[in-house]
């Protein structure tokens, strides 16, 4: 018994990032050496992601409602500058992907890529309609289905009603509930090393690395664009806001948010992680409690890259020449589509036919491109989610620190 306690204390003294790195390395080894054991270990990953997904909608609803309920008049949340950063970042990602698609034209083999059963949206109007319908969804259904647009809308309305008509005791109860749910999130995050171990070992056991070899150039363009945004464009945007070296903040967000998101492959599941990081960075709670869930819905730089690169690859494969005006239009369409990706089943991949329609590409061909996206999804979806989610907290921090700098001046 004493040995067990001392072992747990010893593990507890090791930083969580190092524990995750150990879980990652062990997962790669187990998944490669013993696929059967790796698949069995996948249960730990499923439980971890399931726990995060389960707590995230409740956390967002209660935290936002509590924040608004206790919001004092004259104490602004400063959300607008963050939304502007989200849109700038997403458009920059789409434009970068267009340029990369022109400089490094990619042809893909479509025959035998597989079938995709889900139906893509027919146009921008349908994407926007989906977002608006999510806004007025039943609040219970919104929480049950992790509809964050609906959750945010109802939490804002309920919080405003409590602020104006609730008693001090009622508002304190809601605040205590928010603190309790945040504590539960901390407990879940402590199991991240075990969860990452399960996710990695099962992924390696199921797919190996061979399935990705045939699409190496396409993956290189996708990952290259995402790396350029994460390590060049985003730091430039952050510097513009805070006017000092942005890389310590950038690397902190990539390390403490991006790593989780890469393996969970879920922006929703990463909301609690981003909330905890924002609190650790000392950001304004009234701001991050709203901007981070909102970012998980509309801040989609990774999705914009995926939509654009695969649409450009489809055009090159079909022998279509893309002029600059069309490429610029594609950037705008990809930006709007990416912002609506959370409202579409299948996310960014099923918005590819929408972008392909700009080039007059047949829907059957576009859906084969989507199927290719699912094949490379093991890497593409992980990298996309890591970029999307880490940027949520990065831009929130940049806007908050920039506001503090302006106030100090």
From Swiss-Prot:
GO BP annotation list: serine transport; threonine transport
Single Gene Ontology MF annotation: neutral L-amino acid:sodium symporter activity
Record bears the keyword Isomerase: no
Substrates-to-products reaction catalysed: L-serine(in) + Na(+)(in) = L-serine(out) + Na(+)(out); L-threonine(in) + Na(+)(in) = L-threonine(out) + Na(+)(out)
Record-annotated membrane-spanning stretches: 24-44, 48-68, 82-102, 142-162, 194-214, 218-238, 292-312, 319-339
This protein's UniProt keywords: Amino-acid transport, Cell inner membrane, Cell membrane, Membrane, Symport, Transmembrane, Transmembrane helix, Transport
Membrane topology of the entry: Multi-pass membrane protein
Pfam families: SDF (PF00375)
GO CC term, one of those recorded: plasma membrane
Subcellular localization(s) per the UniProt record: Cell inner membrane
Gene3D superfamilies on file: Sodium:dicarboxylate symporter
InterPro entries: Na-dicarboxylate_symporter (IPR001991), Na:dicarbo_symporter_sf (IPR036458), Ser_Thr_transp_SstT (IPR023025)
Cross-referenced PANTHER family: PROTON/GLUTAMATE-ASPARTATE SYMPORTER, SERINE_THREONINE TRANSPORTER SSTT
Job of this protein: Involved in the import of serine and threonine into the cell, with the concomitant import of sodium (symport system).
Sequence similarity: Belongs to the dicarboxylate/amino acid:cation symporter (DAACS) (TC 2.A.23) family.
Name of the protein: Serine/threonine transporter SstT
Species for this entry: Neisseria meningitidis serogroup B (strain ATCC BAA-335 / MC58)
């Amino acid at each position: 018994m004493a040995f067990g306690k001392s072992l747990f204390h010893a593990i507890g003294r090791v930083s969580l990032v190092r524990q995750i790195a150990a879980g990652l390395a062990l997962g790669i080894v187990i998944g490669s050496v013993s696929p059967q054991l790796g698949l069995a270990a996948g249960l730990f990953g499923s439980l971890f992601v399931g726990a995060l997904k389960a707590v995230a909608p409740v956390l967002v609803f209660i935290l936002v409602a509590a924040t608004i309920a206790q919001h004092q008049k004259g104490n602004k949340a400063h959300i607008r500058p963050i939304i502007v950063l989200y849109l700038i970042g997403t458009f920059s990602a789409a434009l970068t992907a267009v340029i990369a698609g022109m400089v490094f034209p990619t042809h893909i083999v479509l025959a035998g890529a597989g079938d995709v059963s889900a139906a893509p949206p027919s146009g921008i109007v349908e994407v926007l309609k989906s977002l608006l319908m999510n806004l007025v969804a039943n609040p219970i259904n919104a929480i049950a289905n992790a509809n964050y647009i609906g959750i945010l809308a109802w939490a804002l309305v309920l919080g405003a009603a409590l602020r104006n008509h609730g008693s001090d005791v009622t508002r304190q109860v809601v605040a205590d509930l928010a603190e309790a749910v945040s504590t539960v999130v901390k407990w879940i995050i402590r199991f991240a090393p075990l969860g990452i171990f399960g996710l990695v070992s099962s992924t390696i056991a199921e797919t190996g690395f061979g399935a990705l070899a045939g699409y190496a150039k396409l993956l290189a363009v996708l990952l290259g664009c995402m790396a350029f945004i994460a390590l060049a464009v985003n730091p430039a945007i952050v510097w513009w806001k805070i006017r000092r070296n942005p890389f310590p903040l950038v690397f902190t967000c990539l390390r403490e948010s991006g790593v989780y998101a890469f393996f969970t492959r879920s922006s929703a599941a990463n909301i609690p992680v981003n909330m905890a990081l924002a609190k650790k960075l000392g950001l304004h709670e009234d701001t991050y409690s709203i901007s981070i869930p909102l970012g998980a819905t509309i801040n989609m730089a990774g999705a914009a890259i995926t939509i654009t690169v695969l649409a450009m690859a489809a055009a090159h494969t079909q022998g279509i020449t893309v002029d600059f005006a069309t490429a610029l239009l594609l950037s705008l369409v990809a930006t709007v589509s990416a912002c609506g990706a959370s409202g579409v089943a299948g996310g960014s991949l099923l918005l590819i036919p929408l972008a392909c329609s700009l080039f007059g590409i047949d829907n059957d061909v576009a859906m084969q491109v989507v199927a290719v996206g699912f094949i490379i999804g093991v890497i593409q979806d992980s990298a996309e989610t890591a970029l999307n989610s880490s940027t949520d907290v990065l831009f929130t921090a940049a806007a908050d620190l920039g506001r503090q700098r302006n106030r100090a001046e």
